[in-house]
C-alpha cells in the first residue's frame, strides 16, 4: 500500500499541514493492520553493516578517500549522513522537540506536556518529506532525541530538571495539593505526554514513509555501567528491565530497535566488553519479544572508537561488539562516526588506515560467517542466533578454513576457502535459526503465514 501523494505538499505552511494530520492518522490506522518488517534488511544478507558517517567530508575537504565499498558495507551515495539507505534525525531536524537548555531555558515549551504536539507534527510532516523525498524510502529511519527520557525514573542527574519543572507545573495548577499528590500527577502528565510525542512521531513517519525502519536511537537502554564492580556480569539491573517493560507502547510502535553499544573509555583493557555488549543487545531482543514481535529487527549502534576518545577499537573489541551482535541474531549494526572525527586530514587518514587494515576485514569476516551459517542451517531463509548454552560462540570464520586477501590491483577483498565438516557441525551445535517472516521449521524450510 502506498500513501497518498504527500510529497506534493512539501512547502505547505504549518497550518495547512496540520489540517492533514487527521488524514495521516486514518492512514496510520490502516497501516497498522498490515504491519510487516522486511527480513533481512538487505536481501540475502542476514547481517548488514550500515555506515552512518559523514566521511564525504574526508574526500571533499581533505582529499582522503575512505573507501568502504570493498567491505560489503551499506552506505548513502557520497557517504552522507542522510540519504536513501540511512537517515537520522537529530532533535533540531525533526519538528519542534521541547527541551531545556543547559542554562535551564525552555525551548518549545521545555516539557512535552507543556508543548504543542500539533505544531510539532505539522513541522515534522514537512521535515520528513524534505529529508525523504522518495515515497518508497525503505532504509533506516532513526530519531535521536536525548534531552529527556520517556520514563520518569530515568530522568536523573542533569535530566532531573524535567521532573522539577513538571512538579512546578502541577503545583502552579493546584497550589493546595500536598507533595505526594503533586508528584503522582507530575509523573502521570510527563509520561503520558512523552508517550504521545514519541509514539505520535513514529506513527506520522510510518504513515509518510511506511517502508522505513523507524525507531529511536539508544532504546532500549540497559544501564549496565558498573564496570568497577568486582562481580560485574554486564546484566541490566532488574529495576531497569522493569522500567523497560513499561515502554511496550514504544517497542510496539517501532519498526526496528537501535540500542547503543558504544564502548565507554572505562572498558578499555578490562576484558569486560563482551559482557557489556551481550546484555545490551539481549535486552533489545527481550523487549521485542515482550511486545509480541520477536522478529523486530535489532540494529545496534556502534563506533570505531572508544566513546569520547580517539582510540580505535582493536580487533578483539570488534569481535566483542560487531561479532557479538551477529552471534545474537541482530539484523546488523550501524557504524557511527562523529563530525569531529572527520574534521582534519590527519583524522581522515587515520580512519582510512583503520578501515583498510582492521575494520574492513572484520566486517567481511562476520558478514560472511552469518551468510554461510544462514545457508547451511537455515536454508537461506533465516539468520543464525547463538544457543543460550553457548554464550561465547561467534560467527567468526575459522582461520584454518578461510583467508581474506586483497584483490590484485585494488578492489573488494576476496574471501577464499570453504566450510569444513567440523565448521558445519560446530554451527549446528552452537546456533539455531530465527526464520524470516513467512518461513518456519527448524531449518526455515517451510513457507506459509501461520
Swiss-Prot record:
Keyword Transcription regulation: no
Gene3D superfamilies registered for this protein in UniProt: Aldolase class I (3.20.20.70)
Active site feature: 146
Cellular localisation: Secreted; Lysosome
Glycan-modified residues: 85, 231, 365, 398
PROSITE patterns hit by this protein: EGF_1, EGF_2
Disulfide bonds: 58-348, 222-236, 373-384, 378-433, 435-444
Any GO CC annotation of this UniProt entry: extracellular space
Broad class of the protein's primary localization: secreted
EC number: 3.2.1.35
Catalytic activity of the protein: Random hydrolysis of (1->4)-linkages between N-acetyl-beta-D-glucosamine and D-glucuronate residues in hyaluronate
Task performed by this protein: May have a role in promoting tumor progression. May block the TGFB1-enhanced cell growth.
Keywords in alphabetical order: Disulfide bond, EGF-like domain, Glycoprotein, Glycosidase, Hydrolase, Lysosome, Secreted, Signal
Entries under InterPro entries matching the protein: Aldolase_TIM (IPR013785), Glycoside_hydrolase_SF (IPR017853), Hyaluronidase (IPR018155)
Example of a GO MF term: hyalurononglucosaminidase activity
Recorded coiled-coil stretches: none
Signal sequence bounds: 1-35
Full protein name: Hyaluronidase-1
Family per similarity comment: Belongs to the glycosyl hydrolase 56 family.
Lineage top rank: taxon: Eukaryota
Keyword Disulfide bond: yes
Start and end residues of each EGF-like domain: 433-444
GO BP terms, alphabetized: carbohydrate metabolic process; cartilage development; cellular response to interleukin-1; cellular response to pH; cellular response to platelet-derived growth factor stimulus; cellular response to UV-B; hyaluronan catabolic process; hyaluronan metabolic process
